[in-house]
UniProtKB/Swiss-Prot annotation:
Coiled-coil zones: none
Originating organism: Glaesserella parasuis serovar 5 (strain SH0165) (Haemophilus parasuis)
Record keywords, A-Z: Isomerase
One Gene Ontology term, aspect cellular component: cytosol
Zinc-finger keyword on record: no
Name listed for the protein in its UniProt record: Ribose-5-phosphate isomerase A
One Gene Ontology molecular-function label: ribose-5-phosphate isomerase activity
Pathway membership: Carbohydrate degradation; pentose phosphate pathway; D-ribose 5-phosphate from D-ribulose 5-phosphate (non-oxidative stage): step 1/1
Pfam families in the record: Rib_5-P_isom_A
Record family assignment: Belongs to the ribose 5-phosphate isomerase family.
Catalytic residue list: 103
């Protein structure tokens, strides 16, 4: 079974957490695209969605799902998103698609974070297989990079990428994260950082892993 099929299995399993007549929080990325496509079958049963990226907004609208802004809602029942890495505790690295800031905002509105992944995204230590994205105000790029080096990382500027917020991304390589919550706060306190891709303060409450044997749910 290929990776796409496993993503579809996880995405479809997440539908059980979507209640009728609610507004659903939706992230971004390839696994979320599978979820949005599945959610299209419930378009008439839900009020709509709040999306974490412009690309997700467009995909939702194309399926007839009304899109609300984060400022129009006070709370979401669930937020459903993928991850680049996830630990058994539900800590994640996200931001491969450069939507990390909006993903943090929308996920913070939700009572429950449902993370949908294929088995390749499971790790014991964050930073094992994926670089840590950091969204940075453009004028602070070099300063922030030096601070990330001081923390032990190897930051690289993600060229030709501008976030939906008009900022740039530094990807931090060779950077294993043994204390995710502490490191999330440390990096966010660097002047010029908008946010980083560690999701430890807002961790996943439920992880759904797509496998060749079906969906594995970790709560």
């Amino acid at each position: 079974m290929d990776q796409l099929e496993m993503k579809k299995i996880a995405a479809r399993a997440a539908l059980q957490y979507v209640k009728p007549d609610t507004i659903v929080g939706v992230g971004s990325g390839s696994t979320v695209n599978c979820f949005i496509d599945a959610l299209g079958e419930m378009a008439g049963d839900i009020k709509g969605a709040v999306a974490a990226s412009k690309a997700s907004e467009e995909r939702l609208r194309a399926l007839g799902i009304e899109v609300f802004s984060a400022n129009e809602v006070t709370e979401l029942d669930v937020y459903i998103d993928g991850a680049d890495e996830i630990t058994p505790q539900g800590y994640m690295i996200k931001g491969g698609g450069a939507a990390l800031t909006r993903e943090k905002i929308v996920s913070s509105l939700a009572k429950k974070f449902i993370c949908i992944v294929d088995a390749s995204k499971q790790v014991d230590v964050l930073g094992s297989t994926f670089a840590l994205p950091v969204e940075v105000i453009p004028m602070a790029r070099s300063y922030v990079a030096r601070q990330l080096v001081a923390l032990g990382g190897s930051p690289e500027y993600r060229e030709s990428v501008v976030t939906d917020n008009g900022n740039v991304i530094l990807d931090v390589y060779n950077f294993k994260i043994f204390e995710p919550l502490k490191m999330e706060h440390t990096i966010n306190n660097i002047a010029g950082v908008v946010t980083n891709g560690i999701f430890a303060q807002r961790y996943a409450n439920v992880t759904i892993v797509g496998t060749p044997d079906g969906a594995k749910i970790i709560e």
